[in-house]
Amino acid sequence: MIWHVQNENFILDSTRIFMKAFHLLLFHGSFIFPECILIFGLILLLMIDLTSDQKDRPWFYFISSTSLVISITALLFRWREEPIISFSGNFQTNNFNEIFQFLILLCSTLCIPLSVEYIECTEMAITEFLLFVLTATLGGMFLCGANDLITIFVALECFSLCSYLLSGYTKRDLRSNEATMKYLLMGGASSSILVYGFSWLYGLSGGEIELQEIVNGLINTQMYNSPGISIALIFITVGLGFKLSLAPFHQWTPDVYEGSPTPVVAFLSVTSKVAALALATRILDIPFYFSSNEWHLLLEILAILSMILGNLLAITQTSMKRMLAYSSIGQIGYVIIGIIVGDSNDGYASMITYMLFYISMNLGTFACIVLFGLRTGTDNIRDYAGLYTKDPFLALSLALCLLSLGGLPPLAGFFGKLYLFWCGWQAGLYFLVSIGLLTSVLSIYYYLKIIKLLMTGRNQEITPYVRNYRRSPLRSNNSIELSMTVCVIASTILGISMNPILAIAQDTLF
């Protein structure tokens, strides 16, 4: 009898929870319409996978790409609408959040074509890969709009767990398994540190979890200048440093880049940065409004360390993926300048603009690496020697993307860095900008070293990998080449049309 009553109570409680969730989705679903499209795409993928006998079908790629494109379209139609807080304060919709969501969706849309031929060659499961990519994208989008500490943590873990699973996607590869374990342990530790910082904010604000309410709670409890805030700031900055691969919290990055499948590395190298930047700008600017000098100093130190260590260590690398890992550490150091500058001197606008350029430059480089790796089976930098003699299009594409990453004019990377450094100089960050300029020159050295190898024509330097290289046809239907071409064109011409991009980025104030 008692069990029967308890069972009825459980059913009633479950029904109430379900009805409340359904009510929230019914009345607030329009505010997360782009996310709902991705959820529908995920369900459709699962249904087709369960009911279809032929697993390797173009339908999976079509559904994934279509859901991402429709989600981008829905996001663009919602642009310039008034900021809205929905789901009882858990989710916020505004231009600032939406532009980061757009960048995440753009990354995912460009990354899926990179994976098609790779998955076919490695004979890995298609559905799992696409499910993890879409779920990670969904987690990143919710992270961009999360308005309270609990939603931030849940969205962050949704993104992180899918990232761990993607890095270990090739289960038979020992290096991939090793990279996954390191990524999982370091990611779990960083999440714990971040949540510990959140707990300090929760306690000091009198039990508030919404970002703006935390500020009001700190004012009411008179704790906004207490030592506890400094402790919370340190723990949250360390947690964010791991997520952003800022030095000295970057140790996991090279191993994960080298061991994970190359399309996965391409995906994680941009989406994780965009999602973590969206979180960092809001979590530092809103709850730590009264501690701006302190977190500015912390970020300056981390940015300087990242720019110097990232670029110095990149010079010594022999693996292309490890070199790009250290290069990305230096690149995120430049981006941090925009966060430190803030809204006062278009810091956020310069950060968003440079991230758009970085997506095209980085994904273009990884597309070239994926293509070369599939045709030769190597990742060693020396094995690229003489590639221009066999595949001029691939060699020129890689050279353009590397030069853009280095910041040489008239490519997009030059204009992005120029505006970022100019905003930092206007804000009085003279030492930080000087370090950025010096390390940018340093980065050009190791990029040019690779380009010199690509263009060499001396037979004694050309490795057997390039001698036996399979030349691609002039007109290829390869999806990797399609994605590579889009990224190379964007890396070349986006800087010339920078003014409208800046105007859009300047509308993203939150």
Curated annotation (Swiss-Prot):
It is a multi-pass membrane protein. It is an enzyme of class 7 (translocase). The keyword Membrane applies. Its EC number is 7.1.1.-. Its main location: plastid. The keyword Iron does not apply. Keywords: Chloroplast, Membrane, NAD, NADP, Plastid, Plastoquinone, Quinone, Thylakoid, Translocase, Transmembrane, Transmembrane helix, Transport. The chain crosses the membrane at residues 24-44, 59-79, 99-119, 124-144, 149-169, 184-204, 229-249, 261-281, 295-315, 323-343, 354-374, 395-415, 418-438, 484-504. It catalyses: a plastoquinone + NADH + (n+1) H(+)(in) = a plastoquinol + NAD(+) + n H(+)(out); a plastoquinone + NADPH + (n+1) H(+)(in) = a plastoquinol + NADP(+) + n H(+)(out). One of its GO terms (molecular function) is quinone binding. Pfam families: Ndh2_N, Proton_antipo_M. It is found in: Plastid, Chloroplast thylakoid membrane. GO terms for cellular component: chloroplast thylakoid membrane. GO terms for biological process: ATP synthesis coupled electron transport; photosynthesis, light reaction. NDH is composed of at least 16 different subunits, 5 of which are encoded in the nucleus. Belongs to the complex I subunit 2 family. HAMAP family: NDH1_NuoN_1 (MF_00445). NCBIfam families: NDH_I_N, PRK02504.1. NDH shuttles electrons from NAD(P)H:plastoquinone, via FMN and iron-sulfur (Fe-S) centers, to quinones in the photosynthetic chain and possibly in a chloroplast respiratory chain. The immediate electron acceptor for the enzyme in this species is believed to be plastoquinone. Couples the redox reaction to proton translocation, and thus conserves the redox energy in a proton gradient. This is NAD(P)H-quinone oxidoreductase subunit 2 A, chloroplastic. It comes from Zea mays (Maize).
